[in-house]
Swiss-Prot record:
It holds the Pfam family Pribosyltran. The gene is gpt. Its cofactor is Mg(2+). It is found in: Cell inner membrane. Coiled coil: none annotated. Guanine binds at residues 97, 140. It comes from Desulfotalea psychrophila (strain LSv54 / DSM 12343). InterPro entries: PRibTrfase_dom, PRTase-like, Xanthine_Guanine_PRibTrfase. This is Xanthine-guanine phosphoribosyltransferase.
Length: 160
């Protein structure tokens, strides 16, 4: 986690499931989607939940690498693209942060409906639908990036 982040926001599997289902609820009144494009890796779990809720069986991926295990990388690498302009497709990611990945994907698939579970202010204008806004200086701890362990109470953390 780089120095630009002042807070952390841990998300449990249960919360991610609830928030992904809430995103699916918001997408119900949109046009019919012929399939989902999950941005790997973060978009895969939300995409599976949304696919179930919207009864979508066709799922593809686009692979963009913009983070290493610790922090953002300098460039976004396209590891696997998508054929077509995205018309009729639902593009899913876990989070839009600075918008760098979103810009790359929107240029590749400009007609897809872009939805994320979480959005930060810098990237929010690039998505069509999202559920929860998180401050720009917050690092989100997704459940696939964490292990269960003791955490000090908030009051104890502030006194350090």
């Amino acid at each position: 986690m780089s120095d630009q982040y002042k807070r952390t926001y841990p998300i449990s599997w249960d919360q991610l499931h609830r928030d992904s289902k809430a995103l699916a609820w918001r997408l119900l009144d949109k046009d019919f989607f012929k399939g989902i494009i999950a941005i790997t890796r973060g978009g895969m779990v939300p995409a599976a939940i949304i696919a179930r809720e919207l009864d979508i069986h066709l799922i593809d991926t686009i692979c963009i690498s913009s983070y290493d295990w610790k922090e953002k990388k300098g460039e976004a690498d396209i590891l696997k693209g998508f054929d077509g302009d995205g018309e009729g497709w639902l593009l899913i990611d876990d989070l839009v942060d600075t918008g760098r990945t979103a810009e790359v994907v929107k240029n590749l698939i400009p007609k897809a409906h872009f939805a994320t579970v979480y959005a930060k202010p810098s990237g929010r204008p690039l998505v069509d639908t999202f559920v929860t806004e998180v401050s720009q200086d917050t690092w989100i701890l997704f459940p696939w990036d964490t292990e269960s362990q003791f955490a000090a109470p908030l009051i104890g953390r502030e006194q350090r």
